[in-house]
Structures are given as structure tokens and as C-alpha cells.
Amino acid sequence: MLTAHTVEQIRAAEEALAGETGWDALMQRAARGLADALDTIPGGEVVVVLVGPGNNGGDALFAATHLLDRGVRVDLCLLDADRVHADGLRAAQETGAEIVDEPTGQGYCLDAMFGIGARPGLEGRAAEWAAWIDDQQPWTVAVDVPSGLDIDGATADAAHVTADLTVTFGTYKPATLIDPAASACGDVVLVDIGLGPHLPDPVVRVIEPLDGGLLLEALPDPSGHKYTRGVVGIAAGSDEYAGAAHLCVAGAKAGTAGMIRFTGSERLSQQVVGRDPEVVAARGRVQAWAVGSGGGDDVADLVETALADRVPVLFDASALDHLPSSFDTPVLLTPHAGELARMLDVDRAAVETAPWRHARAAAERWNATVLLKGARTLVVRPDGSTSVNLSGTPWLGTAGAGDVLAGFIGSLLATGLSPFDAGSLGAFLHGAAGVAANPGGPVAASEVAAALPAVVADFLAGGLTDVRREGWA
């Protein structure tokens, strides 16, 4: 599992590690790891290094000595010659690096202007060099993080560098995993410098293909039956949006619950049972609900009905417009950016600029887990701890995919998983199913549902491959 930590957490871990090794040794670890990561860079015979003040620039300068030893030509652009890392500059120059006034279009660019301690945004010469990168498009590698990003907030609305590759040290940062900042990082490579024993619990985690053990809690007991596996209630669709009911049920069928109860109009219930005879269209006890996908005029009543059962509930789509002020039962809210904007009474653009901030605000406001759907779906607990999904394909931006996701996660909830774990695993497996359904090409929501059972089996067996989005190296 990938994990990310805040700047404060990283600073404390670095202090503890440096107390054991010394700061010089720690910088040398980072420098060597950076140089090794640069060995296969396109146009790697020449590199221009944008050198800022402090340790970030020092890491790059010491890495330059390794590159020079390997026959690479290194040009140094000093952002502030009076504040440059003196020992690093001396070592680079003694090995053959040359100082130049401005970057050129030769080779690739190493962004070492600012690290994790800097404020978001760039000014003056740093902003000019970032604009030069945007204009000239050299292959750009960021040292630890691209300069100008909001590291802890994972935003990128101020002036910043956009990198093709980010070589980050010790642990991932929120900005390297969460959009929109992550989109400015390109591919991300982690260099181990020994921080692990000194890091606290992460604020962000990412499920990976080999994390199948996380789903073991949802496996059926050998002596169990359909009721012990869990019953999920589906209240989805309407006469106008009948397809949402079918797709939500299809997602639930692909999950881990032993039985599905469907609640809807008589006409819709007949359609659902006619298509899926395993479904029971009668009220009865359930262990979890999925409510709202394609809902009609009765959705407010269905919200009340589901909450009255005092079992975990997933609220999607139109159900999000009828939420009480808080909950006393486990709840998972699954908005997209527009729905979250409506819930919080802000513009959609505000959510898209700072999705993590707004997802955390909603989780705290409703004391519920929030799954914010997007290219990198976020799952956020009320305490702010977060899971980021990196599986999937842009082809999953298709009608009905969210209905399948709601039913599938509802099934996981009915098995006993928490809203956070059900949302995190559900998003990951749903994304993987989108890839498996038609690798590299378009998929329909029904095809995603059909692919899910085999994806779940592969996940449990540790055999999932090719599920990653770009930017996850």
C-alpha cells in the first residue's frame, strides 16, 4: 500500500533520522537516489538544473556530481546565488558543472527551485523559469515536488512547475497523489532514504494490486449462508431512469453480499426481478442500503426509510439532496464534483480546484465518510484520513458507471466492511474492472459490472495487473 504524509510529519521524521545519520548523510542518500532515477531520462546527455535555496537545491547539486561522473553535461541556473547550498555548489563545480544565467533548450530540466517547505506559488525569476518550462516543454524532472504546488493541500491554482517525472524522497506527499496537484507531478518515483521507522500513521493511503488481504473480511464463511454473507437493500432507479436500477443491482450482484432486496415502484420492481431473478422485491431485514442512484420523487422517503433501519447506508445522486444535518449510523456519501458543490453551496469550479479540501469539509460537516468521484477518486473519513484511488481508465467516464459503483460498494457494506474500507476497495476494484472490461478501449457500465467478479477473484489471488492510471510509477 502506498502512503503519504504531511510536511509536518516528514519534517519530524527527517529530524529524527538526521539525529542518527547526520544531515549530510541524509542529503547524500537523496542525491544518489535522484541520480539513479535519472539514468534513463530521454536526452540525458545534458541537464540544466534550476537550483533554489536550501536542501532541495542541495539534493540536486550533489546529484549533479554523480551525473557528471557518468558523463552528463550539467548546467546550473542559480535562483539566488547568495542563498545556494554552498557545499553542494562547490562539489558540483569541482566535478565540472557550469553556471549559466538562464536555462537553454538543450537536454532535460531538473526543477530544484523549492521543496516541501515553500509556500504555494512562484514569483519573480522562479515564475519566469516555470513559464519557460511551459513554453519550451523540455523533459522536466521535479526534485521531491514540483516547485509552486500546495504540498499539504494538493492544489495547483498558483504558478507552479509541471513535471514529466517527480522523484520524491522518503514518503509520498499529498500533492504527489491527489489531483489537481498530482497531475503536475507526472510519473512519481519514490526514493527510500530510511524515513520509514520514524513516520507516524499516514494521512493518505493508496490501495495497490497486491493488497487483496484487505478484502478477506468480506469473504464468505465456509459454514455460512446467504443471510450470514449479508443482505444489501437497493433503492435505486425510477420509471424515468429504470436503467439506474438495473445497473445498481448489477453492481451489487458482483459484490460480496449473499442477497439483494430491491425497493422501487411495482413496475420497476417487476422489471428488475424479470431481468435478475436472484433479486427479492420485498421488504425485509438488510445489513446495508444503497440509496439514490437514478432516484425519483420518492427519494426523500427512501432516505428516511434507510436511516430508520440503523444499518450502514450509501447515499448517491438525488439522495444527496435530502440528507439530514448529521447521522448516527455509518454513512457513505458518493457525490461527483457538481453534487458536492451543491451540497456545500459552492461553485463546482471551487470543488475542482481543491477537491480534497471540500471532501474533507463535507465529511466533517455530516460526520460521514465521503467518496468524491473523479479521475482520482477520494474517500475521506470525518477525521480527514483519506484513500486515493489510482486504478481505472478515462473510459469509465460513461453513463451508469456510478450506479454500478454504488451497488457494488453497498454489497461490500452489507458484508461488514466499514464505509471507508468499502469505499476504498470498491473504487479500486471498480476502476480495475473498467480496465479489464476492454483494455485501452471504451466500456459500457454493464460491461464493468460483468468484469467485476473476475477482478475480485484476481485481487484476492494477487494476480491483478495493468490497472494503474498514468502517474503511478
PLM region spans:
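A short, aliphatic-rich alpha-helical micro-motif
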Residues: 103-107, 160, 283, 307
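Intrinsically disordered, low-complexity, compositionally biased regions/tails
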Residues: 92, 152, 466-467
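Internal gly/pro-rich beta-alpha loop/helix module
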Residues: 106-108, 113-205
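Short acidic-hydrophobic sequence patches enriched in Asp/Glu that either
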Residues: 84, 125, 159, 400, ...
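Small-residue (G/A/S/T)-rich helix-start motifs and N-terminal tracts that mark the onset
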Residues: 1-76, 165, 174-317, 321-332, ...
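Nucleotide and nucleotide-moiety/phosphate-recognizing core
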Residues: 35-113, 121-143
